[in-house]
Swiss-Prot record:
Cofactor: Mg(2+)
Protein name: Adenosylcobinamide-GDP ribazoletransferase
The organism of origin for this protein: Shewanella pealeana (strain ATCC 700345 / ANG-SQ1)
The keyword Oxidoreductase is annotated on this UniProt entry: no
InterPro entries linked to this entry: CobS
Amino acid sequence: MQAWQQQLNLFFIAMGFFTRIPMPKWIEVDADKLNKASRYFGLVGLLVGAISALVYTLMLYWVSPSIAIVLAMITSVLVTGGFHEDGLADTADGLGGGWTVEAKLNIMKDSRLGSYGALALVLALLLKWQLLTELALFDPSSVSLALIVGHCLSRVVAASFIFSEPYVSDSDTSKSKPLAQEQGINELSILLATGILALLLVGVMQALVLTLALTIVRYGFVRLFTKQIGGYTGDTLGAAQQGSELTCYLLLLVLGVSW
């Protein structure tokens, strides 16, 4: 397999893991390739954001921006299978309902939705819709750019945990365990480069503020997860992604998408 085919193979692995988009049949998957595929998590975010933005833009011809935003949000959930939203809900249930590390991890593995998870999920979706709707009041076209940037940067933040933080879940059924064993400097470099590419889509001031704010948000999540469970799980990565995405939308609303 040539170098470009190897990279394409890794991208399709990342896409197949984090979305419901079918992978080509020729894709080769093993533990090492799953680890290396983390370099393209941000690029998958760009793809998901672009699909959502396309739906939003097309729907503007027939419906109001607020309805188009709902349809774009539904699209992103359908494309990803609600993968990250599920992680947010499980994390809220685990951290909110467990008293010990073992109890918190066991609750996260439970497929049932608890009160903490339901609250976190509903509030996150409502806040996401409200932030994007407010952004559309200033400039409806800016929502498309916000979706692309938010989906990309939030996945860059979440995926960077794999490089620096310990994986604590020992469940053989964990959805992210094959990807969580290690992340090399090459993977991290490509991941961060994707984030820089997304930052080029907004103004200089916005890019600087987003970088600083997401660094702080990441630090906060690291401290929280380390204190609560001693590291991260696949579910907490989903929570970090959702929190980072909301942070992007909030800052783009405050600052505007260009300067």
